[in-house]
């Protein structure tokens, strides 16, 4: 009986409503002397790390910085530290292994996770387990998490549902829904931009890294997701 109740509680928790960012919004509205530094952490691979055309890193033309600018425009009283714990070439499996040491140790107020591009060559079950491990660890410390679907890749067949990039995007959407965490569906916006007639070469700096225009698309998608979750003026 106890095992059935445990399973039921897991299922109920899994289908919880997405996290509400109203408390974080209130924190960002707090003025001196009652305010404090707010830690915003971006975890993932080379894209949030700021790589454009490898090995060049353009921190100020990459979505973590662009989101930082948008946050400061909306919350002029807030002290906001944007920290990138991303590592170029990494996938979610080693990313999960270092999550507590490199991410939770920073005492973040919100965490963004972006690994789909590099997860394509990893086994499905290990990828899902890694994402779930990071989400669970964040939930245990009551930190809101935002999952990111990928930016594009010129080698991917974006119109093929069975393309590995589409499959990874679908997995992330499923995990976000099941776990009741936030999602910024960058991949959906990216594909919509392509469908409007924009060549991928105009939003990529190389085969798998966005340029400023591509990072701007990602940042706008992320910020919209935050606003919809309660991050409002």
Q: What does each of the following model-derived ranges do?
A:
Residues 39-41, 72, 78-106, 118-148:
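Internal alpha/beta domain cores that form substrate/cofactor-binding pockets in large enzymes
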Residues 151-233:
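Catalytic His-Asp segment of secreted/periplasmic serine-dependent ester chemistry enzymes
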Residues 19-85, 98-107, 198:
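Serine-esterase "nucleophile elbow" of acetyl-processing enzymes
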